[in-house]
Amino acid sequence: IMPTLARFELEMHERVERGEGLAADLMIERMADLFAESYGGEMSIDRPRVGITWATFSHLYSDYYVYQYATGISAANALSQRILAGTPGAAEAYVRFLSAGSSLYPLDALKLAGVDMATTQPVEAAFAVLAGLVDRLEALVG
């Protein structure tokens, strides 16, 4: 559901940036289209019920909140990979990150642990892990 919500949110912001209006019927239709596309032709959906998701899903009340899942997963992957790889000082840096609590902005706290979310590296590394898992799954199912 999150990729569908992210696409919807981006499209609605782009419409506003182009000076186009938003109306409930348009938003319902677009949300239903995105869910239908995501589920594929094998599954039928109740378009009015699924289409109104945008109005009932609180994640969409904060700008680009849904995208924070992807960045959070990427950061967590980067933190764990440093520790699992035995990177010297990684565990201690992770403890410093945790100890910072809310005393630092999240991006600054992550830098304490050796993760720079201002670069593409953490997201690229997360995709590499995902690609490896897909490869393993494909090998299992033949």
Model-assigned labels for residue ranges:
Residues 2, 6-142:
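C-terminal, non-catalytic "cap/extension" segments appended to globular domains
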